[in-house]
């Protein structure tokens, strides 16, 4: 499934605060960029979730966020779909599911004309913060943030965000930077990179400490 992304849809994202214009796709021949170094707490890819299972919810304890996860694909122009409301997030279903080997991506809005979106404070996460993704199988895939970066949309590193780097990663993506009132959109994207640190049955998740 990663080949679909690499070959046809290495994109900058069009998550908007108030507008609807989308940045152009990155050409498929674009030079891959180096992925961030994995966290020292990351687990080996052999411990990744073995079978694909769609994510059903995302929890970010540091931000007091717990939200259902929908499914997103591609628009007709090759850009990535975005959630229909500011309080929703969506998993890019043409990539791996969270916990599998590869880079899973979940997108959400930073805000709207009505106020903050679900990822309004995403940029404030720091390395070591935890992300928990509950899968349809009942498994909870647990991730630790490794880095947070902001990219101008024209320089969005799609291969780095969407491509497989041999580990089980989860990227969260939203808008950020300067808001352009003429176009009605933000000029940058915020990306939170995280690595898988473990899995647990959903029923046992509340018994597992999220922070050391």
Show which residues each predicted segment covers:
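N-terminal export and membrane-targeting signals
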Residues: 1-5
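Solvent-exposed, non-transmembrane regions of membrane-associated and secreted proteins
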Residues: 9-212
